Structures are given as structure tokens and as C-alpha cells.
Amino acid sequence: MRPAQTNQFDYVKIGLASPERIRQWGERTLPNGQVVGEVTKPETINYRTLKPEMDGLFCERIFGPKDWECHCGKYKESVIEVLSVSAVVLEVTESRVRRHRMGYIKLAAPVAHVGYSKAFLAIFHSVGYALRDVEQIVYFNSYVVLSPGNAETLTYKQLLSEDQWLEIEDQIYSEDSLLQGVEVGIGAEALLRLLADINLEQEAESLREEIGNAKGQKRAKLIKRLRVIDNFIATGSKPEWMVMAVIPVIPPDLRPMVQLDGGRFATSDLNDLYRRVINRNNRLARLQEILAPEIIVRNEKRMLQEAVDALIDNGRRGRTVVGANNRPLKSLSDIIEGKQGRFRQNLLGKRVDYSGRSVIVVGPKLKIHQCGLPREMAIELFQPFVINRLIRSGMVIHQAAPMISRNDPSVWDVLEEVIEGHPVMLNRAPTLHRLGIQSFEPILVEGRAIQLHPLVCPAFNADFDGDQMAVHVPLSLESQAEARLLMLASNNILSPATGKPIITPSQDMVLGAYYLTAENPGATKGAGKYFSSLEDVIMAFQQEQIDLHAYIYVRFDGEIESDQPDTEPVKVTENEDGTRTLLYKFRRVRQDAKGNVLSQYIYTTPGRVIYNNAIQEALAS
């Protein structure tokens, strides 16, 4: 038994890594005292033995061996010790370490990180470098003055062309030269020197003074630059770390090489990009050893810079590196960024159990807190609950499971019991606000489409032209309670963004409300008739004795509201029995001698009576 490793951490922090930190990631000391970690060879595996090459991109000494087996295969099983076998010293341990052990490449010349182009501009704001100027230095097109010495024509950080530098060089090396202390550099080494000379506190102070006097767009740019420098100071990062002297090599199991059926190998694009870097780095180191001409060394440094650029972000600058079939190779940035990247695809978009997905169709007969769940989907999602209920009824699991697979009729009754009061959550991508995922009470329906109440569509931004939605089943009692109390559609009527109702009548509801309450002078059937109650009106309409839009009188002794003032009677009639009848625009009132209301008939249409009745029933329920 091996002790379980518990890696506890509070948070993940992304920042600049120093060369020492990168070296620490990859360096390990074997139990015999040997320090390993540097990848020096571009080879991956030996084509004859099919074993990883030592000090190569898949080296077992650097990244760890196959499961409990040494390089030559002599020692196997759980031998946790260092073995010197076939002149190869390695640690026999589990292969899982090949997923997290890193290596590093020590560069023969520093290279600039292509991802920090804009950060370079923020650091060099006082000089007024443009992005093109920084690139000219890095890619060996322009020289930069590192120290002007006693030359009056030169200034610190001034850019020089090839011709200008040759002219100054002639002056420096002439016999009667008076120039002293002049230093000029080119490439990432010059950039490294400039960055190392920067005092961040002074830069921040001068920026704050400039911001006080600046206005408009210039002020906004200065604030952006100050924010970058303040972040450097706050995190303790140094600007020179943006120029790399050491490159990390990610674990081999994250850039695998797989043998195909025909004996050929399929490999990750990263291996090709790493191989280019190592080849160019080794070639540069050899050229420096043999003291090759400066122009050749400089060209090799530029090629190394381009190889590292392609590894970090292929195609961002210069020519895109392509593999077989002219396909661009996937760099480290391509793996991380975008919809198919590591974050959005694998970390934020994991597939989960107890979930399903289907097309949505309208369910007009559903209540707002209900959704139609296809039987086929429901039996799969609620299978553990169904089996549990069958076992509690006296069955054994070997009887219960086959009943579901053969669609036994008794299973559907159990499923009905199981889903009663068990909410499910519906989610429609993209989930842009919290109402993009809500819970509903499932109702079993035939077919294979999820039925959705039309009023919740605005919250999901859903329509029925082929949209799909995901279903998730909350398992624990706590999650079910939260789904019911917090996430139920009937509890989410107001928009969290504006506070206004997001569930509002739409489409056929608006049309129906308009049609019921509209006026139609052509509707004369039953017009002018009197009815003793609202129920009598509905009954007469159902028996086709009156038109939907015919104006009638119906007795209603309660209070009425109108959008038009109706307080002055149009006509008053005194009756023989001492009562009087007041005729208003929209009602007819009969009062006794003391002015008490004996009866009230309102002037309306059967459509409005039906509409009022529907609202009253909804409020009562």
C-alpha cells in the first residue's frame, strides 16, 4: 500500500516565473545525489528498442519511468530504490509521475517572451517605443544604445540602424578615437539589459506626475501603463523575467506519442515545436564554442527566438510553423485559449453524470414551474432512484435492473412515484446570467423532445427553432431543496439585472387577451340583454346565445375599476316605488330613497367577462 498524497492549496495564482523558479520546476535530485532535469537532446524514442532516449523529450530519468520498471526491464514490481542498470541511473516508481514531472531547456542565449509585447511597451513608456521598435531589437533588425559613454550624438535607449552602428563602430576602433564607454546591443540580450536597469518605483512616480497633467486619451494610456507597473511592484515580479533564459518542458504524458496499428507513431505537435527549439539551441551553443563569426551566431539567435515564439504562440508573429498537410502546429497558447482550449473545454465544460440533452418544443398546457421530460430520458436519469424503490419493495438488484432494460410496464408506475416532487434543472447554453439555469417539476411525456413553458423562454433566450437544452438531476436532499426554493421558475419572475419582470405575457397570450377585450360593432347577437350573474354570461356564450363581443348588461354589485372616469350619470330616472335608476356610461345603478345601492349592472362584453374570470381564478389559486 502506498500512502495517498493530499495536495492541499488555497488558490491558483498566475504570474511571471523567474529563471530560478523554472529550473526548480524541472530539477530533481535522485536518491544517489545526481541532479537531473535538463533536456539536452531533441530525440523522443529509439526507433529500434522503442524506449525513450536518455536526456531526450521523453527521458525516463528526467520525467520518471514506466510503472515500477527500470529502463532495461531487469527490475520490476515495487522496488523503490535507485538502480544503476545498463549504466543508466533512474528511480523505479509509478508512471503516474510522468503526468506532472517537468523538465527544462537551458538556452544558449536569452529570448523574449512573445506574449509580453504590450508589457514591454508599458515598461518603456518614457522612451516612447512602439511595438515595432521592440520587435526590431528582438529580431536583430535594430541596435539599441545601452550606454552612450562620452558620445554627444548618442542617448540612452536610442535605436540605431545597421549603417549607423557601422559608422559609430568605425569611430570607436579608429586610432585617434576619443569615444569611450559606448555600449550598443541587439536582440533579447539587449532587451534583458534594458529591463534589468529599470527602477520600477521611479517609473511609477514619473507616470503619476504625467497623469496629473495629462487629459483625454493620453491620460487613459498612461493609467493603463501605470497599472502594469504597479502590478509588477505588488507581485514582486521583475521586468527582466519577461526575457527567458530557461524554458520549461511540460510532462511527457501531456504531449504523448502513440504507436498506431501500422507501426507508425502519432505525436503531439508540441514535441515537434520543442524539437525545433532544442536543435537550434544546441546548434547555437556549438557555434559559440567554436567562436563562429558574429553574423552567423546572430542569425542562429534570431532563429532560436522564432522557434521559442512558435512554441509559445505559433503564428502570432512571423511565418506560421506547419506540419504534415500544411496544417499549423498547435502551440501552448492554442492548447489553452479559445472554446476548444483547456479551460473552456475541459475545466469549465466537463461532462457530468445524471444529465441529458434534447431539443425543446413548446408545452402550452404546462404550468410555469413544470417541464415535459421524455420517458426515455427520465428512466435513464432516474434509474438509481427507480432501482432503489424496486429493491425497497422486496426485489433484488438482479431482478430490478433487467426490468428497466426490457421496459416492464410496472417500471413506469414506479418512475411516476420517483419523479413526483423531485425537481430537475434545465440549462440552455450560453448561460449568460443566473436565469440561464432554472429548476422545474418534471412531467413524463411521450416523444423525445423536452417540453418547455413558453413564458420562461425570455429568461433562457430560447426559441423553438431547434434549440437544445441540458437536463441535470439534483441528487442530495439539500440540492433538491435549493432547486425547489431558489431555482424554481415560478420563483424567478424578476430579472436580476434590471429588477423588471422577465416573465411577461407574449405572443398568443397577448393576442388572446386583445381578442377577448376588443370591441366589434358588428357583433349584435344578444346585444342589450340583461344577466343576473357572470356565470350566466359564460353559460349563455357557451350555448351560442350571445356573441363574444356583443355589449350586454350583467349584474355585479362589487367595486369596478375603469381607465376612464365614470362618476357622472348620463341620465337619472325616478321610479314610482321611490327608487331611482342612474345610467352611467359603463354601468346602470339602482338606488333606494336614501341613496343606498340596490343593484348594479355593468355594461360589458362576454369576452371581458371570460378574461376577468380567468384572472380571478389565477389569483385565487
Curated annotation (Swiss-Prot):
GO terms for biological process: DNA-templated transcription. InterPro entries: DNA-dir_RpoC1_gamma, DNA-dir_RpoC_beta_prime, RNA_pol_asu, RNA_pol_N, RNA_pol_Rpb1_1, RNA_pol_Rpb1_3, RNA_pol_Rpb1_3_sf, RNA_pol_Rpb1_clamp_domain. Its EC number is 2.7.7.6. One of its GO terms (molecular function) is DNA binding. Pfam families: RNA_pol_Rpb1_1, RNA_pol_Rpb1_2, RNA_pol_Rpb1_3. Mg(2+) binds at residues 463, 465, 467. It is an enzyme of class 2 (transferase). Binds 1 Mg(2+) ion per subunit. In cyanobacteria the RNAP catalytic core is composed of 2 alpha, 1 beta, 1 beta', 1 gamma and 1 omega subunit. When a sigma factor is associated with the core the holoenzyme is formed, which can initiate transcription. This is DNA-directed RNA polymerase subunit gamma. The gene is rpoC1.
